Amino acid sequence: MSWQPELDELRRRQAMTREMGGADKVKRQHDGGRLTVRERIERLVDKDSFREIGSIAGKAEYDSKNDLLHLTPANAVMGRAKIDGRHVAVTGDDFTVRGGSADATIKEKDLFIERYANQFRVPLIRLIEGSGGGGSVKTIETTGRANVPGVRGWEMVVNNMGTIPTVGLGLGSVAGLGAARLAATHYSVMVKEISAMFVAGPPVVNRLSPRQFDKQDLGGWEIQLRAGAIDEATDTEDEAFACARRFLSYLPSSVYDVPARGPVTDDPDRREESLFDAIPRDIRKVYRIRPIIEKVVDQGSFFEMGKLYGRSVVTGLARVDGWPIAVMASDPMFYGGGWTADACQKVERFVDTAQTFHLPVVYFCDCPGFLIGLEAEKSGVIRQGVRAMSAMFQTTVPWCSFIIRNAFGVAGAAHQNGGRLNWRYAWPSGRWGSLPLEGGIEAAYRADLDAAPDRKAKMEEIEERLNKLRSPFRSAETFWIEEIIDPRDTRRILCEFVDVAAPVRGVGPSTHWMRP
Protein backbone atom coordinates (compact mmCIF):
# COMPACT_ATOMS: atom_id res chain seq x y z
CA MET A 1 0.00 0.00 0.00
CA SER A 2 1.45 3.37 -1.03
CA TRP A 3 1.44 6.67 0.83
CA GLN A 4 -0.07 8.52 -2.12
CA PRO A 5 -3.22 9.61 -0.21
CA GLU A 6 -1.11 11.32 2.42
CA LEU A 7 1.05 13.00 -0.20
CA ASP A 8 -2.07 14.17 -2.00
CA GLU A 9 -3.36 15.63 1.27
CA LEU A 10 -0.05 17.37 1.84
CA ARG A 11 -0.21 18.94 -1.63
CA ARG A 12 -3.83 20.01 -1.04
CA ARG A 13 -2.89 21.75 2.20
CA GLN A 14 0.13 23.41 0.63
CA ALA A 15 -2.07 24.69 -2.18
CA MET A 16 -4.39 26.23 0.42
CA THR A 17 -1.59 28.04 2.24
CA ARG A 18 -0.12 29.32 -1.03
CA GLU A 19 -3.37 31.15 -1.63
CA MET A 20 -2.30 33.34 1.32
CA GLY A 21 -5.20 35.53 2.46
CA GLY A 22 -7.27 34.81 -0.65
CA ALA A 23 -7.65 36.36 -4.09
CA ASP A 24 -9.34 39.53 -2.80
CA LYS A 25 -6.59 40.23 -0.27
CA VAL A 26 -3.88 39.52 -2.83
CA LYS A 27 -5.55 41.92 -5.28
CA ARG A 28 -5.72 44.57 -2.55
CA GLN A 29 -2.00 44.08 -1.91
CA HIS A 30 -1.21 44.54 -5.59
CA ASP A 31 -3.57 47.51 -5.92
CA GLY A 32 -1.58 49.17 -3.14
CA GLY A 33 1.57 48.83 -5.22
CA ARG A 34 3.00 46.08 -3.02
CA LEU A 35 4.19 42.57 -3.78
CA THR A 36 2.97 39.56 -1.83
CA VAL A 37 5.36 37.89 0.57
CA ARG A 38 5.93 34.96 -1.78
CA GLU A 39 6.68 37.27 -4.69
CA ARG A 40 9.13 39.15 -2.48
CA ILE A 41 11.04 36.05 -1.48
CA GLU A 42 11.17 34.86 -5.09
CA ARG A 43 12.69 38.18 -6.22
CA LEU A 44 15.11 38.45 -3.29
CA VAL A 45 16.87 35.08 -3.39
CA ASP A 46 18.63 33.02 -6.04
CA LYS A 47 16.28 31.40 -8.53
CA ASP A 48 14.64 28.19 -7.27
CA SER A 49 16.70 28.23 -4.06
CA PHE A 50 13.94 28.89 -1.52
CA ARG A 51 12.99 25.93 0.67
CA GLU A 52 9.99 26.74 2.82
CA ILE A 53 9.83 25.60 6.44
CA GLY A 54 6.39 25.30 8.02
CA SER A 55 4.57 25.29 4.70
CA ILE A 56 1.25 24.04 6.13
CA ALA A 57 1.32 25.79 9.49
CA GLY A 58 -1.86 27.76 10.03
CA LYS A 59 -5.39 27.73 11.38
CA ALA A 60 -7.42 24.74 10.21
CA GLU A 61 -11.21 24.37 9.99
CA TYR A 62 -12.66 20.86 10.25
CA ASP A 63 -16.14 19.47 9.75
CA SER A 64 -18.01 17.21 12.16
CA LYS A 65 -16.08 14.21 10.83
CA ASN A 66 -12.75 15.96 11.40
CA ASP A 67 -12.14 16.31 7.69
CA LEU A 68 -10.31 19.48 6.69
CA LEU A 69 -12.51 22.21 5.24
CA HIS A 70 -9.98 25.00 4.91
CA LEU A 71 -6.50 25.95 6.07
CA THR A 72 -5.66 29.62 6.61
CA PRO A 73 -1.88 30.01 6.68
CA ALA A 74 0.05 31.66 9.47
CA ASN A 75 0.92 35.20 8.49
CA ALA A 76 4.64 34.54 8.10
CA VAL A 77 6.44 32.66 5.34
CA MET A 78 9.94 31.50 6.18
CA GLY A 79 12.65 29.14 5.07
CA ARG A 80 16.19 28.74 3.85
CA ALA A 81 17.54 29.97 0.54
CA LYS A 82 20.65 31.22 -1.18
CA ILE A 83 21.78 34.70 -2.16
CA ASP A 84 24.68 34.84 -4.60
CA GLY A 85 25.20 31.16 -3.90
CA ARG A 86 25.49 31.63 -0.14
CA HIS A 87 23.10 30.11 2.40
CA VAL A 88 20.70 32.53 4.12
CA ALA A 89 17.54 32.40 6.21
CA VAL A 90 14.49 34.42 5.12
CA THR A 91 11.27 35.30 6.89
CA GLY A 92 8.49 37.47 5.54
CA ASP A 93 5.24 38.84 6.94
CA ASP A 94 2.11 38.00 4.96
CA PHE A 95 0.01 41.15 5.17
CA THR A 96 -2.84 39.46 3.32
CA VAL A 97 -3.52 37.37 6.44
CA ARG A 98 -4.86 39.62 9.21
CA GLY A 99 -2.40 42.39 8.39
CA GLY A 100 0.48 40.53 9.99
CA SER A 101 -0.94 40.89 13.52
CA ALA A 102 -0.62 38.54 16.48
CA ASP A 103 -3.98 36.82 16.19
CA ALA A 104 -2.86 35.12 12.95
CA THR A 105 0.67 34.41 14.09
CA ILE A 106 2.27 31.13 15.07
CA LYS A 107 5.00 32.47 17.30
CA GLU A 108 7.04 29.29 17.06
CA LYS A 109 7.72 30.06 13.39
CA ASP A 110 9.35 33.40 14.27
CA LEU A 111 11.38 31.78 17.03
CA PHE A 112 12.44 28.93 14.76
CA ILE A 113 13.89 31.09 11.98
CA GLU A 114 15.83 33.29 14.42
CA ARG A 115 17.30 30.19 16.05
CA TYR A 116 17.93 28.51 12.72
CA ALA A 117 19.97 31.46 11.44
CA ASN A 118 21.88 31.65 14.70
CA GLN A 119 22.74 27.99 15.07
CA PHE A 120 23.56 27.39 11.40
CA ARG A 121 25.45 30.71 11.27
CA VAL A 122 23.78 32.17 8.20
CA PRO A 123 22.57 35.73 7.50
CA LEU A 124 18.92 36.50 8.26
CA ILE A 125 16.68 38.72 6.14
CA ARG A 126 13.35 39.91 7.56
CA LEU A 127 10.70 41.14 5.11
CA ILE A 128 8.45 43.16 7.39
CA GLU A 129 4.96 44.52 6.85
CA GLY A 130 2.32 45.22 9.47
CA SER A 131 2.86 44.74 13.17
CA GLY A 132 5.28 41.89 12.59
CA GLY A 133 3.30 39.51 14.74
CA GLY A 134 2.73 42.14 17.38
CA GLY A 135 -0.39 42.61 19.44
CA SER A 136 -3.87 43.52 18.30
CA VAL A 137 -6.78 44.61 20.46
CA LYS A 138 -8.72 41.72 18.93
CA THR A 139 -6.33 39.35 20.70
CA ILE A 140 -8.07 40.19 23.99
CA GLU A 141 -11.32 38.85 22.62
CA THR A 142 -9.86 35.75 20.99
CA THR A 143 -7.83 34.74 24.05
CA GLY A 144 -10.24 35.96 26.70
CA ARG A 145 -7.57 37.89 28.55
CA ALA A 146 -5.17 40.81 28.33
CA ASN A 147 -1.53 39.83 28.14
CA VAL A 148 1.19 41.38 30.26
CA PRO A 149 3.57 42.86 27.62
CA GLY A 150 6.47 40.62 26.74
CA VAL A 151 8.49 39.87 23.65
CA ARG A 152 9.05 36.15 23.63
CA GLY A 153 12.27 35.20 21.91
CA TRP A 154 13.74 38.71 21.87
CA GLU A 155 16.88 37.34 23.51
CA MET A 156 17.59 35.55 20.22
CA VAL A 157 17.14 38.79 18.27
CA VAL A 158 19.73 40.36 20.58
CA ASN A 159 22.03 37.37 20.23
CA ASN A 160 21.82 37.53 16.45
CA MET A 161 23.00 41.15 16.48
CA GLY A 162 26.32 39.85 17.79
CA THR A 163 26.48 36.68 15.71
CA ILE A 164 25.07 36.91 12.18
CA PRO A 165 24.33 39.68 9.67
CA THR A 166 20.68 40.68 9.96
CA VAL A 167 18.84 42.74 7.36
CA GLY A 168 15.39 44.29 7.70
CA LEU A 169 13.27 45.49 4.78
CA GLY A 170 10.19 47.56 5.64
CA LEU A 171 7.87 46.87 2.72
CA GLY A 172 4.68 48.55 3.87
CA SER A 173 3.47 50.12 7.09
CA VAL A 174 5.30 48.64 10.08
CA ALA A 175 4.33 49.40 13.66
CA GLY A 176 5.00 48.20 17.18
CA LEU A 177 6.88 44.91 17.19
CA GLY A 178 7.23 45.12 13.42
CA ALA A 179 9.07 48.43 13.76
CA ALA A 180 11.24 46.95 16.50
CA ARG A 181 12.17 43.99 14.29
CA LEU A 182 13.10 46.40 11.50
CA ALA A 183 15.27 48.52 13.78
CA ALA A 184 17.00 45.52 15.40
CA THR A 185 19.17 44.88 12.35
CA HIS A 186 22.58 45.76 10.99
CA TYR A 187 21.06 47.22 7.83
CA SER A 188 17.50 48.36 7.18
CA VAL A 189 15.64 49.70 4.16
CA MET A 190 12.23 51.26 3.52
CA VAL A 191 10.53 51.72 0.16
CA LYS A 192 9.44 55.26 -0.62
CA GLU A 193 5.72 55.92 -1.00
CA ILE A 194 4.59 52.46 0.19
CA SER A 195 6.50 52.16 3.49
CA ALA A 196 6.00 53.82 6.85
CA MET A 197 7.39 53.01 10.27
CA PHE A 198 6.16 54.04 13.71
CA VAL A 199 5.78 52.94 17.29
CA ALA A 200 2.02 53.45 16.90
CA GLY A 201 0.20 54.32 13.70
CA PRO A 202 -2.18 57.17 12.86
CA PRO A 203 -5.35 55.50 14.26
CA VAL A 204 -3.75 55.48 17.71
CA VAL A 205 -1.87 58.77 17.51
CA ASN A 206 -4.73 60.76 16.02
CA ARG A 207 -6.97 59.95 18.98
CA LEU A 208 -4.46 61.62 21.29
CA SER A 209 -3.14 64.46 19.16
CA PRO A 210 -4.79 67.71 18.04
CA ARG A 211 -2.86 67.33 14.80
CA GLN A 212 -4.07 64.61 12.45
CA PHE A 213 -1.44 62.52 10.67
CA ASP A 214 -1.40 60.20 7.73
CA LYS A 215 1.16 57.41 7.50
CA GLN A 216 3.78 59.40 5.63
CA ASP A 217 3.43 62.45 7.89
CA LEU A 218 3.97 60.32 10.96
CA GLY A 219 6.59 57.81 9.90
CA GLY A 220 7.48 58.15 6.25
CA TRP A 221 10.83 57.13 4.84
CA GLU A 222 12.38 60.60 5.01
CA ILE A 223 11.49 61.03 8.68
CA GLN A 224 12.98 57.68 9.62
CA LEU A 225 16.05 58.02 7.41
CA ARG A 226 16.89 61.43 8.88
CA ALA A 227 16.25 60.09 12.39
CA GLY A 228 18.67 57.22 11.85
CA ALA A 229 15.98 54.59 12.44
CA ILE A 230 16.73 53.08 9.02
CA ASP A 231 19.78 53.09 6.76
CA GLU A 232 18.35 53.47 3.26
CA ALA A 233 15.21 54.22 1.27
CA THR A 234 14.61 53.01 -2.27
CA ASP A 235 12.08 53.77 -4.98
CA THR A 236 11.00 50.16 -5.50
CA GLU A 237 10.91 46.85 -3.68
CA ASP A 238 13.31 45.34 -6.22
CA GLU A 239 15.83 48.07 -5.39
CA ALA A 240 15.44 47.23 -1.70
CA PHE A 241 16.20 43.58 -2.46
CA ALA A 242 19.28 44.65 -4.42
CA CYS A 243 20.47 46.73 -1.46
CA ALA A 244 20.08 43.75 0.86
CA ARG A 245 22.06 41.51 -1.47
CA ARG A 246 24.81 44.07 -1.89
CA PHE A 247 25.11 44.74 1.85
CA LEU A 248 25.52 41.03 2.54
CA SER A 249 28.19 40.73 -0.16
CA TYR A 250 30.66 42.64 2.04
CA LEU A 251 30.08 40.56 5.17
CA PRO A 252 30.87 37.04 6.34
CA SER A 253 28.03 34.62 6.98
CA SER A 254 28.67 34.92 10.71
CA VAL A 255 31.24 36.15 13.19
CA TYR A 256 32.90 32.75 12.91
CA ASP A 257 34.12 33.64 9.40
CA VAL A 258 36.07 36.57 8.00
CA PRO A 259 34.82 38.72 5.10
CA ALA A 260 35.79 37.06 1.84
CA ARG A 261 37.93 38.71 -0.79
CA GLY A 262 36.05 39.43 -3.99
CA PRO A 263 37.35 39.61 -7.54
CA VAL A 264 40.27 42.00 -8.08
CA THR A 265 38.84 44.43 -10.62
CA ASP A 266 40.98 47.54 -10.14
CA ASP A 267 44.67 48.39 -10.39
CA PRO A 268 46.20 48.67 -6.88
CA ASP A 269 48.72 51.20 -8.22
CA ARG A 270 46.11 53.45 -9.81
CA ARG A 271 46.86 57.12 -9.04
CA GLU A 272 44.22 59.81 -9.25
CA GLU A 273 45.77 63.14 -10.19
CA SER A 274 42.70 65.02 -8.95
CA LEU A 275 43.61 64.10 -5.35
CA PHE A 276 46.65 66.37 -5.59
CA ASP A 277 44.52 69.49 -5.13
CA ALA A 278 41.34 67.95 -3.71
CA ILE A 279 41.67 69.88 -0.42
CA PRO A 280 41.49 73.69 -0.84
CA ARG A 281 44.28 75.77 0.71
CA ASP A 282 41.69 78.21 2.00
CA ILE A 283 40.38 76.56 5.16
CA ARG A 284 37.10 78.44 4.76
CA LYS A 285 36.36 76.50 1.58
CA VAL A 286 34.74 73.09 1.69
CA TYR A 287 34.99 70.16 -0.67
CA ARG A 288 33.05 66.99 -1.45
CA ILE A 289 34.34 63.90 0.33
CA ARG A 290 32.47 61.19 -1.58
CA PRO A 291 34.43 61.63 -4.84
CA ILE A 292 37.63 61.29 -2.79
CA ILE A 293 36.43 58.00 -1.29
CA GLU A 294 35.37 56.69 -4.68
CA LYS A 295 38.77 57.51 -6.19
CA VAL A 296 40.77 55.47 -3.68
CA VAL A 297 38.60 52.37 -3.20
CA ASP A 298 37.90 49.84 -5.96
CA GLN A 299 35.88 51.56 -8.64
CA GLY A 300 32.14 51.26 -8.10
CA SER A 301 32.51 49.45 -4.77
CA PHE A 302 31.53 52.17 -2.27
CA PHE A 303 28.20 51.33 -0.62
CA GLU A 304 27.04 54.19 1.60
CA MET A 305 24.85 53.65 4.65
CA GLY A 306 22.81 56.24 6.56
CA LYS A 307 23.31 59.10 4.12
CA LEU A 308 20.73 61.49 5.62
CA TYR A 309 21.58 60.92 9.29
CA GLY A 310 24.56 62.29 11.21
CA ARG A 311 25.57 63.99 7.99
CA SER A 312 28.92 65.38 9.13
CA VAL A 313 30.25 61.80 8.94
CA VAL A 314 29.97 59.55 5.89
CA THR A 315 29.91 55.80 6.51
CA GLY A 316 29.81 52.84 4.17
CA LEU A 317 31.33 49.61 2.98
CA ALA A 318 33.75 49.25 0.10
CA ARG A 319 36.42 47.02 -1.38
CA VAL A 320 40.12 47.69 -1.75
CA ASP A 321 42.02 45.27 -3.99
CA GLY A 322 38.98 43.03 -3.58
CA TRP A 323 39.04 43.05 0.24
CA PRO A 324 35.93 44.35 2.09
CA ILE A 325 36.52 47.32 4.40
CA ALA A 326 34.47 49.73 6.51
CA VAL A 327 34.93 53.36 5.45
CA MET A 328 34.36 56.46 7.60
CA ALA A 329 34.99 60.00 6.44
CA SER A 330 34.33 63.51 7.67
CA ASP A 331 32.03 65.60 5.48
CA PRO A 332 32.92 69.30 5.73
CA MET A 333 29.72 70.20 3.88
CA PHE A 334 27.90 69.72 7.21
CA TYR A 335 29.13 71.55 10.32
CA GLY A 336 32.60 71.61 8.82
CA GLY A 337 32.92 67.92 9.63
CA GLY A 338 32.34 68.51 13.35
CA TRP A 339 30.80 65.70 15.34
CA THR A 340 27.17 66.30 16.30
CA ALA A 341 25.31 64.06 18.74
CA ASP A 342 23.67 62.14 15.90
CA ALA A 343 26.98 61.82 14.04
CA CYS A 344 28.46 60.28 17.19
CA GLN A 345 25.60 57.76 17.37
CA LYS A 346 26.18 56.94 13.71
CA VAL A 347 29.91 56.41 14.29
CA GLU A 348 29.29 54.19 17.32
CA ARG A 349 26.88 51.89 15.49
CA PHE A 350 29.03 51.73 12.37
CA VAL A 351 32.24 50.95 14.25
CA ASP A 352 30.42 48.27 16.23
CA THR A 353 29.29 46.68 12.95
CA ALA A 354 32.86 46.68 11.64
CA GLN A 355 34.14 45.18 14.89
CA THR A 356 31.42 42.53 14.96
CA PHE A 357 32.13 41.28 11.45
CA HIS A 358 35.92 41.71 11.37
CA LEU A 359 36.05 44.53 8.81
CA PRO A 360 39.22 46.66 8.77
CA VAL A 361 38.34 50.34 9.26
CA VAL A 362 39.61 53.16 7.06
CA TYR A 363 38.97 56.71 8.27
CA PHE A 364 39.46 59.92 6.29
CA CYS A 365 39.59 62.49 9.07
CA ASP A 366 38.72 66.17 8.74
CA CYS A 367 37.21 66.82 12.15
CA PRO A 368 37.47 70.25 13.83
CA GLY A 369 36.05 68.73 17.04
CA PHE A 370 32.64 68.32 18.59
CA LEU A 371 29.93 70.75 17.58
CA ILE A 372 29.88 73.62 20.09
CA GLY A 373 27.17 75.96 21.35
CA LEU A 374 23.99 75.78 23.39
CA GLU A 375 22.08 73.45 21.07
CA ALA A 376 25.03 71.07 20.93
CA GLU A 377 25.22 70.98 24.72
CA LYS A 378 21.47 70.38 24.97
CA SER A 379 21.81 67.44 22.58
CA GLY A 380 24.22 65.71 24.95
CA VAL A 381 26.99 65.72 22.37
CA ILE A 382 29.76 65.01 24.87
CA ARG A 383 28.13 61.84 26.20
CA GLN A 384 27.35 60.63 22.69
CA GLY A 385 30.89 61.55 21.72
CA VAL A 386 32.56 59.52 24.42
CA ARG A 387 30.30 56.57 23.54
CA ALA A 388 31.59 56.76 19.97
CA MET A 389 35.16 57.06 21.22
CA SER A 390 34.66 54.10 23.54
CA ALA A 391 33.42 52.01 20.62
CA MET A 392 36.55 52.94 18.67
CA PHE A 393 38.87 52.18 21.58
CA GLN A 394 37.20 48.79 22.09
CA THR A 395 37.91 47.66 18.54
CA THR A 396 40.45 44.99 17.75
CA VAL A 397 40.12 45.17 13.95
CA PRO A 398 42.94 46.83 11.98
CA TRP A 399 42.68 50.60 11.46
CA CYS A 400 44.14 52.88 8.81
CA SER A 401 43.60 56.63 9.23
CA PHE A 402 44.32 59.50 6.86
CA ILE A 403 44.25 62.99 8.35
CA ILE A 404 43.35 64.94 5.24
CA ARG A 405 42.68 68.27 6.93
CA ASN A 406 41.54 68.89 10.52
CA ALA A 407 42.03 66.82 13.67
CA PHE A 408 41.28 69.01 16.67
CA GLY A 409 40.18 68.44 20.23
CA VAL A 410 38.73 65.31 21.76
CA ALA A 411 36.73 64.39 18.66
CA GLY A 412 39.79 64.93 16.49
CA ALA A 413 41.70 62.52 18.72
CA ALA A 414 39.12 59.86 17.89
CA HIS A 415 40.59 59.16 14.48
CA GLN A 416 41.88 55.75 15.58
CA ASN A 417 42.05 53.36 18.51
CA GLY A 418 44.76 55.12 20.50
CA GLY A 419 45.44 52.02 22.56
CA ARG A 420 46.58 49.92 19.60
CA LEU A 421 49.13 50.20 16.85
CA ASN A 422 47.51 51.57 13.69
CA TRP A 423 48.44 52.69 10.23
CA ARG A 424 48.22 56.48 10.18
CA TYR A 425 49.10 58.99 7.47
CA ALA A 426 48.65 62.69 6.90
CA TRP A 427 48.16 64.57 3.70
CA PRO A 428 50.16 67.82 3.39
CA SER A 429 46.87 69.62 4.06
CA GLY A 430 46.69 68.10 7.55
CA ARG A 431 46.38 70.41 10.56
CA TRP A 432 45.85 69.42 14.17
CA GLY A 433 46.01 70.50 17.78
CA SER A 434 43.95 70.98 20.91
CA LEU A 435 41.98 73.80 19.28
CA PRO A 436 41.94 75.37 15.82
CA LEU A 437 44.02 78.56 15.85
CA GLU A 438 41.03 80.51 14.62
CA GLY A 439 39.30 80.07 17.98
CA GLY A 440 42.16 79.04 20.22
CA ILE A 441 44.20 82.24 19.92
CA GLU A 442 41.42 84.30 21.42
CA ALA A 443 41.27 82.02 24.45
CA ALA A 444 45.00 81.43 24.97
CA TYR A 445 46.30 84.95 24.26
CA ARG A 446 43.46 87.08 25.61
CA ALA A 447 45.73 89.09 27.93
CA ASP A 448 48.18 89.88 25.12
CA LEU A 449 45.37 90.85 22.78
CA ASP A 450 43.69 93.05 25.39
CA ALA A 451 46.98 94.85 26.10
CA ALA A 452 47.88 95.45 22.45
CA PRO A 453 47.25 98.94 21.01
CA ASP A 454 46.13 97.30 17.75
CA ARG A 455 44.24 94.12 18.58
CA LYS A 456 43.81 93.02 14.97
CA ALA A 457 47.49 93.45 14.16
CA LYS A 458 48.46 91.53 17.28
CA MET A 459 46.09 88.72 16.33
CA GLU A 460 47.66 88.48 12.87
CA GLU A 461 51.16 88.48 14.36
CA ILE A 462 50.36 85.62 16.74
CA GLU A 463 48.56 83.67 14.04
CA GLU A 464 51.49 83.97 11.61
CA ARG A 465 53.94 82.83 14.29
CA LEU A 466 51.86 79.83 15.28
CA ASN A 467 51.09 78.83 11.71
CA LYS A 468 54.78 78.18 11.14
CA LEU A 469 54.99 76.07 14.28
CA ARG A 470 51.90 73.96 13.52
CA SER A 471 53.26 72.74 10.19
CA PRO A 472 52.71 68.99 9.77
CA PHE A 473 56.44 68.70 9.09
CA ARG A 474 57.18 69.80 12.66
CA SER A 475 54.99 66.99 13.93
CA ALA A 476 56.63 64.46 11.62
CA GLU A 477 60.07 65.50 12.90
CA THR A 478 59.13 64.28 16.37
CA PHE A 479 57.13 61.26 15.08
CA TRP A 480 53.84 62.70 16.31
CA ILE A 481 52.60 61.81 12.85
CA GLU A 482 54.17 58.70 11.38
CA GLU A 483 54.21 59.70 7.72
CA ILE A 484 53.12 62.50 5.40
CA ILE A 485 52.22 61.28 1.92
CA ASP A 486 51.37 62.47 -1.54
CA PRO A 487 47.55 62.19 -1.67
CA ARG A 488 47.87 60.43 -5.01
CA ASP A 489 49.56 57.50 -3.24
CA THR A 490 46.57 56.91 -0.97
CA ARG A 491 45.11 54.02 -2.97
CA ARG A 492 48.43 52.19 -3.18
CA ILE A 493 48.86 52.48 0.59
CA LEU A 494 45.31 51.26 1.19
CA CYS A 495 45.91 48.21 -0.98
CA GLU A 496 49.06 47.44 0.99
CA PHE A 497 47.15 47.94 4.25
CA VAL A 498 44.39 45.46 3.45
CA ASP A 499 46.94 42.92 2.29
CA VAL A 500 48.84 43.18 5.59
CA ALA A 501 45.62 43.31 7.63
CA ALA A 502 43.95 40.26 6.07
CA PRO A 503 45.90 37.57 7.98
CA VAL A 504 45.49 39.25 11.39
CA ARG A 505 41.69 39.46 11.30
CA GLY A 506 40.33 37.25 14.05
CA VAL A 507 37.08 35.29 14.15
CA GLY A 508 34.49 34.74 16.83
CA PRO A 509 32.20 37.06 18.80
CA SER A 510 33.40 40.53 19.69
CA THR A 511 34.40 41.27 23.26
CA HIS A 512 31.27 43.44 23.45
CA TRP A 513 28.03 42.56 21.69
CA MET A 514 26.49 45.03 19.34
CA ARG A 515 23.20 46.73 20.14
CA PRO A 516 20.83 48.10 17.48
Task: Describe the predicted segments one by one.
Residues 1-516:
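Ligand-binding clefts of soluble mixed alpha/beta catalytic domains
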